[in-house]
């Protein structure tokens, strides 16, 4: 099989694998395994795209099923692994999350589906894979595959509109103002940009400090932010670097050293969801294992110590 044929499909395969697993590391492993199977001398392929999509989907289903126990024993909230790219979107990973169904909030919703529902929904609704092929991936009937996708669709639409709704065209403007206000310590502007029902959700698996439970409501989120400033210092938000997080404006930071009596802050990625011109969700990913798809990926191998969670 020609390498060029496979490389022409790599972006598509990464897009499928990432949506199925929610992690860049797993997606890369899956695409590599698909290449090894493609490169086998015994492999005869009539339709490379369909064949490779099926292989990637089956591997993704296996990953989801094997990950179920790990996620049950995970410390705190499990969030998808974000894809962080430059503002010019020239990073090859930017194309993997270019579509709206890969926005961070959309990936969070996918985490709430059963593995078979997720596969059926992603393949059919996301990539227009016929139900006959979806059924082949799942080892079930076409009718059962349709039912799985239907149930997944209902589960997705049943999620709060603030999370499952369409991306807000004012996203970049709102996030830019929020980050500037945070860096300047302008709490009045910060409050004005938060939706009354805003949530702050942390994910570190106990490896770095973050919220132990989701913080809900603008008043509580503002108090939480004030607590962060008291802990890490007034330069906390000035350390953020704007970037695209799953195709939408967000931020990341390599962390801060502990100086002048303030504590050191671990590296983290901030994904932000905007609806109706207001910030309705802040996602704080501080687990270094989830930095694979970001400029912080070198930090994965560096020990961070067991993090003490912020109380909320």
UniProtKB/Swiss-Prot annotation:
Region Disordered: list its residue ranges.
293-312
Q: Which InterPro entries match?
A: ECF_Sigma-70_Domain, NTF2-like_dom_sf, RNA_pol_sigma-70_dom, RNA_pol_sigma70_r2, RNA_pol_sigma70_r4_t2, RNA_pol_sigma_r2, RNA_pol_sigma_r3/r4-like, SnoaL-like
Q: Which GO terms describe its biological process?
A: DNA-templated transcription initiation; response to hydrogen peroxide
Self-association state and partner proteins as the record states: Interacts transiently with the RNA polymerase catalytic core formed by RpoA, RpoB, RpoC and RpoZ (2 alpha, 1 beta, 1 beta' and 1 omega subunit) to form the RNA polymerase holoenzyme that can initiate transcription.
Briefly, what is this protein's role?
Sigma factors are initiation factors that promote the attachment of RNA polymerase to specific initiation sites and are then released. Extracytoplasmic function (ECF) sigma factors are held in an inactive form by an anti-sigma factor until released, although no anti-sigma factor is known for this protein. Regulates the promoter of SigI, may not be autoregulated.
Comment text on domains = The sigma-70 factor domain-2 mediates sequence-specific interaction with the -10 element in promoter DNA, and plays an important role in melting the double-stranded DNA and the formation of the transcription bubble. The sigma-70 factor domain-2 mediates interaction with the RNA polymerase subunits RpoB and RpoC.
Q: Which family does it belong to?
A: Belongs to the sigma-70 factor family. ECF subfamily.
> What is the protein name for this chain?
ECF RNA polymerase sigma factor SigJ
* Organism name: Mycobacterium tuberculosis (strain ATCC 25618 / H37Rv)
């Amino acid at each position: 099989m020609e390498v060029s044929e496979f490389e022409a499909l790599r972006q598509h395969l990464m897009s499928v694998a990432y949506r199925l697993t929610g992690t860049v590391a797993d997606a890369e492993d899956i695409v590599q395994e698909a290449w090894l199977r493609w490169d086998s001398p015994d492999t005869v392929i009539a339709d490379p795209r369909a064949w490779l999509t099926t292989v990637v989907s089956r591997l993704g289903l296996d990953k989801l099923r094997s990950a179920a126990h790990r996620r049950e024993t995970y410390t705190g909230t499990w969030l998808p692994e974000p894809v962080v790219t430059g503002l010019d979107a020239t990073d090859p990973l930017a194309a993997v999350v270019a579509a709206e169904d890969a926005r961070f909030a959309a990936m969070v919703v996918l985490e709430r589906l059963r593995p078979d529902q997720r596969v059926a929904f992603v393949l059919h609704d996301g990539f227009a894979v016929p139900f006959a092929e979806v059924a082949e991936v799942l080892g079930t009937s076409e009718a059962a595959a349709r039912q799985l996708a239907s149930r997944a669709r209902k589960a997705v639409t049943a999620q709060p509109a603030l999370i499952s709704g369409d991306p807000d065209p004012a996203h970049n403007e709102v996030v830019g103002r929020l980050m500037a206000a945070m860096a300047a310590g302008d709490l009045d502007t910060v409050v004005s940009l938060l939706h009354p029902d805003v949530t702050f959700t942390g994910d570190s698996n106990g490896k770095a400090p973050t919220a132990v439970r989701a913080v809900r409501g603008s008043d509580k989120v503002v108090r939480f932010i004030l607590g962060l400033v008291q802990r890490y210092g007034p330069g906390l938000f000035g350390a953020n670097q704007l970037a695209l997080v799953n195709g939408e404006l967000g931020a990341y930071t390599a962390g801060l050293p502990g100086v002048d009596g303030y504590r050191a802050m671990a590296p983290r990625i901030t994904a932000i969801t905007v609806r109706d011109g207001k910030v309705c969700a802040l996602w704080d990913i501080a687990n270094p294992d989830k930095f694979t798809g970001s400029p912080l990926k070198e930090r994965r191998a560096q020990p961070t110590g067991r993090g003490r969670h912020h109380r909320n």
